[in-house]
Amino acid sequence: MNTKNLLLWASLALAMPMTAQTPQEDFKRDITLSGSNYVAYRGPQKQLTPAPKGYKPFYLSHYGRHGSRFMIGNKAYDVPYFSLLKAKQEGKLTAKGEETLAKVKMIREEAKGRDGELTPLGALQHQGITKRMMERFPEIFAGNTNIEARSTLVIRCILSMENGLQQMLRMNPKLHIFHDASEHDMYYMNQGDRHLDSLKNCVGIKVVQQEFAQKHINCTRLMKELFNDPAWVKQNINQSDLNRKLYEMASSIQGTELRGKVSLYDLFTAEELYQNWLNANIWWQMAYGNSPYTGNVQPFSQRNLLRDIIQKADSCIALQHPGATLRYGHDTMVTPLTCLLNLNGYGEEIKDPEKVASQWFDYKITPMATNLQFVFYRNKANDVLVKVLLCEDEATLPIKSDVAPYYHWADFKAYCLEKLKGYKK
């Protein structure tokens, strides 16, 4: 697909609203939103609130996920392909199964040698994000100001960063850009935590998730759609695994050059897609949100990232024209940081697994290229305000403010530091 067509697709995606009362209504309007963390980035859905009189933007701090990518690991493509191929060789495929095998083969071949790599659409997403940054906050990026950009060591993140920076330079060649990807910075850019990981991967949480999946996912109809011998299926196919991988494959197509050319959504009913999404959605909430099943502490995995945001902001506030600090990483950082800050209420505890879907929407938190932007404003008296954008839309915080969605920097900083005191490990 050429650049002109990519730009057209991206503009259409930006025009799609993402506000509806329920996930089912969202999915009915746009089936690709059922794709959990594979959802292709939509961009801002709302107009920005004008700044209070006398305040102008002067600094931006950011953390963003890489853009749309191919799926990770050979099994993501091989399990559906070889399961269907074996059935074909043994005469166990239906006509629909034959059709699906041909589609899966095409999808697998497109991804060959591109394990987890950034797609062309993923690159375009980051060009669009930085373009809008500069258009929305021109004062921050004017003249020969400084841009400090860092990425994790993963190539899709590095390429996301480079695409964003190239767009910036096209719009302002005077920018002074520092960019890096080093293990030196991974303690906050991509922090590991054995204690939190142990809670996330314990037997108890897996049992809860398995019980939830057994209650909500039924693969019987799908298996009959693909295979002509139920007894053979029981002996040869891991039905739940095949269902999950076909759902993920169907979801991932929207971020590749096969979008609009091939689809696997016809394999699922609307209810089956919703149930698959429920299962993915609850996994994200329990793994990275404020869940009693994982100790109510998973958001603290981003404690070092939040400290870095605060410390660099304090340093930049002292400068006349500080520019921007950009960070490029993963959904596994943006999501818990969103919860740690309790943006839009996503940091609230959810005790009942059955209520997660009414309070937590992974496709609004964790799409490809999801990002948090902290935009700083000040007036002539040097009073500093900050507002937070989630996926480029203004987010709310549980902080009292006379100018919301703008918050006084002193209040925001105190709120964050108090949060960080709550974690003792």
Regions found by a protein language model. Give the residues of each.
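Bacterial Sec-dependent N-terminal signal peptides
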Residues: 1-23
